[in-house]
């Protein structure tokens, strides 16, 4: 059981998620915010992180250099872009810092790079830090085992108009969980959207539909549909704080782990 505060740093502090992470760090008594990093040339360099997040002064001026903050934190929390996350993970591996990665949109090669860095430092990488979503994945395993081979499976996800990647990392993870449970290869059975004359649906496929609109924080539904009945398993997030709190929980857990690549299922003791 930890008795000392976990020292964290946050990258991309000016973004919507970054500001929420700062607020979460302020709220949690066992978290100490040591640094907030922004891109070089940002007009926010030197601004107090707490003032930026609207939670009052925290005496943490925003910097543009991880090197300058190297002695101020033990775990980096990163919700940026795949390219930036790779740079940050490389830096952490070289400097003995753990890292929690909530970034989505990685390609296969980038994921392999993260795995290589994780041989040198502890890494939690998860497309969704919300506790409820990670429970959702366990429920999907059960549903797929019981109904998967006898139903049409669709995954529907919705996010705000500013989200850059589609389908979301969470939706893809849902597909991976279902496909793995059923012994299928998601790369071969996934159908991303439909248009025109598509013909009768192939039951071996897993369909994906994406919504980008307004300020939707995050909604995900897995649909198992047969003739005469269907089951829908849904998670809806109404605030980014659920992701931020999950990231803080991951940081608190990760600081006590050896080098390796972990996910939120392990953080939460679900596997």
From Swiss-Prot:
Its main location: cytoplasm. GO terms for biological process: diaminopimelate biosynthetic process; lysine biosynthetic process via diaminopimelate. NAD(+) binds at residues 12-17, 38, 102-104, 126-129. SUPFAM superfamilies: Glyceraldehyde-3-phosphate dehydrogenase-like, C-terminal domain, NAD(P)-binding Rossmann-fold domains. It is found in: Cytoplasm. It is an enzyme of class 1 (oxidoreductase). (S)-2,3,4,5-tetrahydrodipicolinate binds at residues 160, 169-170. NADP(+) binds at residue 39. It holds the Pfam family DapB_C. InterPro entries: DapB_C, DapB_N, DapB_N_CS, DHDPR_bac, NAD(P)-bd_dom_sf. Keywords: Amino-acid biosynthesis, Cytoplasm, Diaminopimelate biosynthesis, Lysine biosynthesis, NAD, NADP, Oxidoreductase. GO terms for molecular function: 4-hydroxy-tetrahydrodipicolinate reductase; NAD binding; NADP binding; oxidoreductase activity, acting on CH or CH2 groups, NAD or NADP as acceptor. It catalyses: (S)-2,3,4,5-tetrahydrodipicolinate + NAD(+) + H2O = (2S,4S)-4-hydroxy-2,3,4,5-tetrahydrodipicolinate + NADH + H(+); (S)-2,3,4,5-tetrahydrodipicolinate + NADP(+) + H2O = (2S,4S)-4-hydroxy-2,3,4,5-tetrahydrodipicolinate + NADPH + H(+). Pathway: Amino-acid biosynthesis; L-lysine biosynthesis via DAP pathway; (S)-tetrahydrodipicolinate from L-aspartate: step 4/4. The keyword Oxidoreductase applies. The keyword Transmembrane does not apply. Transmembrane segments: none annotated. HAMAP family: DapB (MF_00102). This is 4-hydroxy-tetrahydrodipicolinate reductase. The lineage of its organism: Bacteria, Pseudomonadati, Pseudomonadota, Gammaproteobacteria, Alteromonadales.
């Amino acid at each position: 059981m930890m008795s000392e505060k976990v020292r964290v740093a946050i990258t991309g502090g000016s973004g919507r998620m970054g500001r929420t992470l700062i607020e979460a760090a302020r709220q949690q008594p066992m978290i100490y915010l040591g640094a907030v990093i922004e891109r070089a040339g940002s007009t926010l360099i030197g601004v107090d992180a707490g003032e930026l997040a609207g939670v009052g002064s925290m005496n943490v001026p925003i910097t543009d250099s991880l090197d300058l903050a190297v002695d101020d934190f033990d775990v980096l929390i990163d919700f940026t872009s795949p390219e930036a996350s790779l740079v940050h993970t490389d830096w952490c591996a070289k400097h003995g810092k753990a890292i929690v990665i909530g970034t989505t949109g990685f390609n296969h090669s980038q994921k392999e790079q993260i795995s290589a860095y994780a041989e040198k430092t502890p890494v939690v990488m998860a497309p969704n830090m919300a506790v409820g979503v990670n429970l959702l994945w366990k429920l999907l395993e059960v549903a797929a085992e019981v109904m998967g081979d006898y139903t049409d499976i669709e995954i529907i996800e919705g996010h705000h108009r500013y989200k850059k990647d589609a389908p979301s990392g969470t939706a893809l993870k849902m597909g991976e969980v279902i496909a793995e449970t059923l012994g299928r290869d998601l790369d071969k059975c996934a159908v991303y959207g439909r248009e025109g004359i598509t013909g009768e649906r192939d039951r071996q496929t897993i369909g994906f539909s994406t919504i980008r609109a307004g300020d939707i924080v995050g909604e995900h539904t897995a649909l198992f549909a047969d003739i005469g009945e269907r089951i829908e398993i849904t998670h809806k997030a109404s605030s980014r704080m659920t992701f931020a709190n999950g990231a803080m929980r991951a940081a608190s857990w990760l600081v006590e782990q050896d080098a390796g690549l972990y996910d939120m299922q392990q953080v939460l003791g679900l596997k």
